[in-house]
A protein has these predicted regions:
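Active-site hotspot residues in diverse enzymes, especially metal/ion-binding acidic/histidine motifs
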Residues: 1-175
Length: 175
C-alpha cells in the first residue's frame, strides 16, 4: 500500500464482491466467523488460544484483534472478552487487511493509519451495506444508531461512525 490516502473505492468493491458471492449472508446480522471461513482459509481464534501458537498478543498493541501469518497460514486472534458486536467488527476489520492486500509489516505510522481507515470502511460496508441503507431510506426509514444496532447487530460506536461516513459519502457524491 503506497497510496497517500485510503482507497475507499477498493474497500467498497471488495466488500461488495463478498456480499454478493456469499452464501452465508442470507439476513442481517450474520456470523463473521462463518463468512471469513467461507471466503478464505483464515482461521479465527480467541486471544485465550494465542499461547497454543506461541503468540504474545500484547506485543502487537491491539486490545481487540490482530491478523497474523504463521507458517503461511493466516489467523485472526480476537479478544473474547469484548462485546459480540465489537468482536464481529474487529474480526471483519482484520479480514479486510488480507482482502485489501495490506502489507503486514508496516513501514510508517502514516501507512498504518491509511490501512486502518480503509479496513474500518471495509468492515462497515460488510456489516451495514450502503446499498441496503439507501434502500431503507428510500422506503422512508430513518437511519439512526438504534436502527443500525438493532437491524445489523453492530455496536453503538460502529453505528455512529457509519452514519457519519454515509453523510460524508452523500455530500461527496453530490459534488
Amino acid at each position: 500500500m503506497t497510496d497517500s490516502k485510503p482507497n475507499f473505492q477498493k474497500a467498497y468493491i471488495n466488500a461488495n464482491e463478498i456480499l454478493v458471492s456469499s452464501k452465508i449472508i442470507t439476513n442481517f446480522p450474520y456470523s463473521a466467523t462463518k463468512l471469513i471461513k467461507e471466503q478464505s482459509s483464515i482461521v479465527c481464534r480467541s486471544f485465550d488460544k494465542a499461547h497454543k501458537y506461541n503468540v504474545d498478543i500484547e506485543a502487537f498493541g491491539s486490545d481487540s484483534a490482530v491478523i497474523m501469518n504463521l507458517d503461511d497460514k493466516y489467523i485472526i486472534f480476537y479478544n473474547q472478552n469484548e462485546m459480540p458486536e465489537r468482536i464481529k467488527f474487529s474480526m471483519l476489520h482484520e479480514f479486510g487487511h488480507k482482502v485489501n492486500n495490506h502489507k503486514f509489516i508496516v513501514t510508517s505510522d502514516e501507512v498504518y493509519g491509511i490501512a486502518e481507515v480503509e479496513t474500518n470502511y471495509f468492515a462497515a460496508q460488510l456489516l451495514m451495506p450502503e446499498q441496503i441503507l439507501r434502500e431503507f431510506q428510500k422506503r422512508g426509514r430513518r437511519i439512526d444508531k438504534y436502527f443500525l444496532m438493532t437491524i445489523f447487530g453492530v455496536s453503538e460506536q460502529a453505528a455512529i461512525k457509519r452514519i457519519e461516513n454515509l453523510n460524508q459519502i452523500t455530500w461527496e457524491r453530490s459534488q
